[in-house]
Amino acid sequence: MSREKEPEKGKRKGSGRDYTKVVCSFCGRSSDEVSNMVAGPDAFICDRCIMSSVEILRKEISAIKQPSKEDGDSFQPRLISPKNIMESLGQYVVGQERARKSLAVAVYNHYRRIESQEWVRDAEDDVVIEKSNILLIGPTGTGKTLLAQTLANLLDVPFTIVDATSLTEAGYVGDDVETILTRLLQASDFNLERAERGIIYVDEIDKIARKSANVSITRDVSGEGVQQALLKILEGAVVGVPPRGGRKHPEQQLINVNTRNILFICGGAFEGLSKLIGRRVAKASMGFGSKVKAQQAEADPEILQKVTQDDLHEYGLIPEFIGRLPVISTLDPLDAKALRNILVEPKNALVKQYQKLFEMDGCELVFDEDALDKVVEIALDRGTGARALRSVLENIMIDIMFELPSMTGVTKCRITLGTINGDGLPEFSFEDSDTKKTA
C-alpha cells in the first residue's frame, strides 16, 4: 500500500514556496519574531501590522464617518438645527412661539445626545448628557398633539400617541405601560433600531395625577400607580415587550426594547392648575386684597407660564415623575385671531383641505370673509380650541359634499355668511353660464 509523499520541510503541500524564511512585507519582521503571519499571493503581513492597521482605520472612520439611515447597524434621525425646526413647526402650528422654540431646542439636544453616544469612544473624555423628556401644558385644542406629530414627521422617526387614561398598573384591568412600546414597535414596522430612536406622545397625562394629597388605603391603580410604573421607561431601561401587545404571560416571547433614546412628550390640559398657581402668586400679597389678586392671577391668560414643579406636585404628580420631565413648556389659549389664522394659514389649514377635496371634483371652493369670521365665533364659544373649527365646518359642509359629486357642470361653490348661519344656501357657478344658482 503506497503512502502519499510528505512535502519537504518548510514547504506547503502543492506549493514550491518556502515558508520557513518569510518576512512581513510591511515591517520586515521574520516569522520567528511574530505569532502569526498571513500570506497573500505575493506578500506577507504579520499579526502586529494587522493590529496596527485596525487601530489606524478605526480612528479614521470614527473621525470622518457620519451616521446615516443607510448604515445597517446605526439608524440616525434627520438632524435639523433648532431654528429650522421652529420654522418648520410654524408652517403647521399657528402661534405658540415660546412652545415651538422650547421644543426645537429640546429635540435638537436629545438627538445630539444620541449622536454623541454613538460616536464618542473614549469614556474618560465623554460627558454623559442626561435624557430630557418634555411636558406640554395647555388648554385643549391648542396644538400639543400636532406639535409632537409634526416633529416626528420632520425628523422622520417612528411616532405613536398613547392615551394615559387607558393605562393601569400591572395586574389590573387596562393596558400595561409596556403597551406604549408595543405601539411604537408597530409604528416602526417592528424595526427595533428605528423604534429605539422614536417619539412617544402620552396624551391626557394630567388624568393620572394622584387623586388626593392624602395617602389612601385603597390603591390608586390608574393614578399614582401608573406614574410609578412609567418611571423606569421614561428614564431609560431595557423593557421586555409583548410583540402583539396585551398582557405578559409565561412562555411568551418578548422583544427587549431599550428606552434610553426614546423621546417622551407628555401633554395635558391640567384643568385647575391655574388656580393653584394663582393662589401661590397671591400669597406674596397678604391682607384684604390678597383674595382679589388671586382671582386676577387666575384670569391671566399667561398664568401657566409661571408654573413650577411644586405646583405640579400639588396638582398630583409625584416628584420622581416630575423629575423625569425636565423640559416644561406651556401653550397659550387660542383667541379669535389665532383661530382665524388656523383656518387659512398653515400648510394643512382646514380651508385648504376642503378646497383640495372640492378640487378633486373639479370645483373651486370659496369662503366669504364674514363667513370665516362667523365660523371662528362659533368655535370660540364652544371652548375646545382648534378642534371646534373642524366640528363647525364639518356640520356646514357635509350636505354640500354629499350633493356635489352628483351635480354636473359645477365650477365654483361659494360659502356665504348665510350658509354658516343656516338661513342661506351656498352659491354654485356652472360651466358656460354667468348665472349663479343656489343649491
From Swiss-Prot:
Sorted alphabetically, the keyword list is:
ATP-binding, Chaperone, Metal-binding, Nucleotide-binding, Zinc
Specify the superkingdom: Bacteria
Its taxonomic placement starts with: Bacteria, Pseudomonadati, Chlorobiota, Chlorobiia, Chlorobiales
- Please state every residue range assigned to the domain named ClpX-type ZB: 12-65
Tell me a Gene Ontology molecular-function term this record carries.
Answer: ATP-dependent protein folding chaperone
The record ties this protein, via SMART domains, to: AAA (SM00382), ClpB_D2-small (SM01086), zf-C4_ClpX (SM00994)
Could you confirm whether the keyword Kinase appears in this record? no
Q: Which GO terms describe its biological process?
A: cell division; proteolysis involved in protein catabolic process
Q: Where does the chain bind Zn(2+)?
A: C24, C27, C46, C49
- What does this protein do, in the record's words? ATP-dependent specificity component of the Clp protease. It directs the protease to specific substrates. Can perform chaperone functions in the absence of ClpP.
This chain belongs to which protein, by name? Answer: ATP-dependent Clp protease ATP-binding subunit ClpX
Gene3D superfamilies found in the cross-reference section: 1.10.8.60, ClpX chaperone, C4-type zinc finger domain, P-loop containing nucleotide triphosphate hydrolases
On subunit structure and binding partners, the annotation says: Component of the ClpX-ClpP complex. Forms a hexameric ring that, in the presence of ATP, binds to fourteen ClpP subunits assembled into a disk-like structure with a central cavity, resembling the structure of eukaryotic proteasomes.
- Protein family according to the UniProt entry: Belongs to the ClpX chaperone family.
The residues that the entry says bind ATP are P139, T140, G141, T142, G143, K144, T145, L146
| GO annotation, cellular component aspect | HslUV protease complex
